């Protein structure tokens, strides 16, 4: 993988679209609304726990994991949502993983992929996702808004991912309610938790915010907890000897 990660993966996504059909929309899986849950449980830093076998930056993380068991451990440990990598080429994920996990837990599931088309959104919803990811850096603002509105029209919630102030302003502009701040630069792969801290000064009270990437310890959690409703954690949980203990370490009391 080159340092030009985002253009490379978006090119791959365009190629995948050629063979992707527009599925008929199936009933939405019933669970709670993530936005409402995060607003109601603001006294504790909530955990979005990720199931991922590999990543371009880390390589293989946990290829032999029982994905359903892992997800059920996350739910039992108190995770607010489970993020499921569905990209095959770069993250060794699969849309079937999302379906299997969504059918085995009762909490919201996030379709974690590089979504650039309505067909991907419908496919994710049909696989049980109740939340999808849209990345500001991956889409022109007009297209981002179109996909956001399309997903919302299907009853889905949308996690809109940002990395800098201009992207955060776009997220606010399109009406995003759930906004992620990725501490990882998708071009250079570099991770800096200060990204979350710097952008937090521009947050709005009517939104919820999730800090993503580079959070491994309770100390990391303490840095972002005053400003964020939740953190998205993948590698630290996939490599943990005891998932419940790790979630407890990260889900710190904000009171």
Swiss-Prot record:
Keyword set includes ATP-binding: no
GO biological process: L-tryptophan biosynthetic process
Enzyme Commission number, as recorded: 4.1.1.48
Record keyword Isomerase present: no
Protein name in the entry: Indole-3-glycerol phosphate synthase
Coiled coil: none
NCBIfam families in UniProt: PRK00278.1-3 (NF001371), PRK00278.2-4 (NF001377)
Record GO terms (molecular function): indole-3-glycerol-phosphate synthase activity; phosphoribosylanthranilate isomerase activity
Lineage per the UniProt record: Bacteria, Bacillati, Bacillota, Bacilli, Lactobacillales
Gene that produces this protein: trpC
Pathway: Amino-acid biosynthesis; L-tryptophan biosynthesis; L-tryptophan from chorismate: step 4/5
Keywords: Amino-acid biosynthesis, Aromatic amino acid biosynthesis, Decarboxylase, Lyase, Tryptophan biosynthesis
Sequence similarity: Belongs to the TrpC family.
Organism annotation: Streptococcus mutans serotype c (strain ATCC 700610 / UA159)
PROSITE patterns with a match to the protein in the record: IGPS (PS00614)
């Amino acid at each position: 993988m080159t340092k030009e990660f985002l253009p490379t993966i978006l090119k791959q996504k365009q190629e995948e679209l050629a063979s992707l059909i527009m599925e008929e929309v199936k009933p939405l899986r019933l669970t709670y609304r993530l936005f409402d849950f995060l607003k109601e449980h603001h006294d504790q830093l909530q955990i979005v726990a990720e199931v991922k076998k590999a990543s371009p930056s880390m390589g293989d993380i946990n290829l032999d994991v029982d994905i359903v068991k892992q997800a059920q451990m996350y739910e039992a440990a108190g995770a607010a949502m489970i993020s499921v990598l569905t990209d095959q080429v770069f993250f060794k994920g699969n849309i079937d993983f999302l379906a299997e996990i969504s059918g085995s837990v009762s909490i919201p599931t996030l379709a974690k992929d590089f979504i650039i088309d309505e067909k991907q959104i419908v496919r994710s919803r049909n696989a049980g996702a109740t939340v999808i990811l849209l990345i500001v850096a991956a889409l022109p603002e007009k297209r981002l808004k179109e996909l956001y509105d399309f997903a919302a029209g299907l009853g889905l919630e949308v996690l809109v991912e940002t990395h800098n102030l201009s992207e955060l302003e776009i997220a606010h502009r399109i009406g995003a309610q759930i906004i992620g701040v990725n501490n990882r630069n998708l071009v250079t792969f570099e991770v800096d938790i200060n990204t979350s801290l710097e952008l937090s000064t521009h947050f709005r009270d009517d939104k919820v915010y999730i800090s993503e990437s580079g959070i491994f310890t309770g100390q990391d959690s303490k840095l972002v907890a005053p400003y964020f409703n939740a953190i998205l954690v993948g590698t630290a949980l996939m490599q943990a000897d005891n998932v419940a203990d790790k979630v407890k370490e990260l889900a710190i009391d904000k009171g």
